[in-house]
A protein has these predicted regions:
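Short, small-residue-biased leader/transition segments that mark boundaries at the very start
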Residues: 2-7
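Hydrophobic, glycine- and aromatic-enriched re-entrant/interface helices and adjoining loop segments
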Residues: 11-100, 121-125
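Short aromatic-rich membrane-water interface segments that cap or initiate transmembrane helices
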Residues: 39, 156-166
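Loop-to-helix entry and N-terminal half of a specific, functionally important transmembrane alpha helix
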Residues: 116-154, 161
Length: 173
């Protein structure tokens, strides 16, 4: 195994990806990828939620439109606003400052969990705390990223904020 072997594998992987896309993926999977890359391809279908989400976040501006005053959230243009797109509702109704504060609070929580992982007395406590920090970080990045159109829509809840009993209960445990 040399460095040349790694390069060969990387080149084969790069060549394989387009081949997989064109010859292996079913049409609905291709559509999901295409709409993720450009939501305007299907603005009333697969791209609808992300376009409405971005519009909601952008219309909130710095201070927001006020609680229960957001046009996208209150008029029903943003459907799963209490679960998948809760961050869009926060951005529209409460504005950039509160939306940024939500991110800061998550980063504080994750930083504290990493601190606990570093100062734990045994390996098990360290692994559990680091794992919890990783889960919160993943959920935060995935949910906020999908509401901004940076990541594909997956349905991952925003911890402690999204509506849903099982997710909230799991986060508290």
């Amino acid at each position: 195994r040399g460095l040349g072997d790694v390069y060969k594998r990387q080149i084969l992987a790069v060549i394989a990806l387009p081949l997989l896309y064109f010859f292996v993926l079913p049409s609905h999977a291709k559509t999901r990828i295409d709409v993720f890359l450009n939501p305007n391809l299907d603005p009333r279908g697969s791209g609808y939620n992300v376009l409405q989400s971005k519009l909601a976040i952008g219309s909130g501006k710095l201070l927001g439109m006020g609680i229960k005053n957001g046009s996208q959230t209150q008029l029903g243009y943003l459907y799963p606003q209490t679960t998948d797109f809760i961050y869009s509702a926060i951005g529209e109704e409460m504005g950039f400052i509160i939306a940024a504060l939500v991110i800061v609070l998550y980063l504080i929580l994750i930083t504290k969990a990493i601190y606990v992982a570093k100062t734990a007395r045994d390996d098990l406590g360290s692994y559990i705390s680091a794992g919890i920090a990783g889960i919160f970080l993943f959920h935060m990045v995935e949910n906020i990223g999908m509401t901004m159109g940076l990541l594909p829509i997956t349905g991952v809840p925003l911890p402690f904020v999204s509506y849903g009993g099982s997710s909230l209960l799991t986060n508290f445990i």
